[in-house]
């Protein structure tokens, strides 16, 4: 889908650092976790952040 904007990456990395236990490799569960952990006003941004987090977990590229 292309390169993610830096604000998506920043939100995703912060969420993974502080709430890692909430996220899994399932996109739908991550959407709910992003909605509960943040106050992102738009569905589009929430879905992009959830997708970024899911991709990081599935590829194993997230490191503490």
Curated annotation (Swiss-Prot):
Signal peptide (from-to): none
Pfam family, one: Ribosomal_S17e
PROSITE patterns listed in its UniProt record: RIBOSOMAL_S17E
GO terms under biological process: translation
InterPro entries: Ribosomal_eS17, Ribosomal_eS17_CS, Ribosomal_eS17_sf
GO molecular function, one term: structural constituent of ribosome
SUPFAM superfamilies: Rps17e-like (SSF116820)
Keyword annotations of the record: Ribonucleoprotein, Ribosomal protein
GO cellular component, as recorded: cytosol; ribonucleoprotein complex; ribosome
HAMAP family assigned: Ribosomal_eS17 (MF_00511)
Membership in a protein family: Belongs to the eukaryotic ribosomal protein eS17 family.
PANTHER family: 40S RIBOSOMAL PROTEIN S17
Designated name of the protein: Small ribosomal subunit protein eS17
Provenance organism: Methanospirillum hungatei JF-1 (strain ATCC 27890 / DSM 864 / NBRC 100397 / JF-1)
Gene: rps17e
């Amino acid at each position: 889908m292309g390169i993610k904007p830096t604000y998506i990456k920043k939100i995703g990395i912060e969420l993974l650092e502080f709430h890692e236990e909430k996220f899994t490799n399932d996109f739908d569960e991550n959407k709910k976790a992003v909605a509960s952990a943040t106050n992102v006003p738009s569905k589009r941004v929430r879905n992009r952040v959830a997708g970024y987090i899911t991709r990081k977990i599935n590829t194993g590229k997230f490191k503490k």
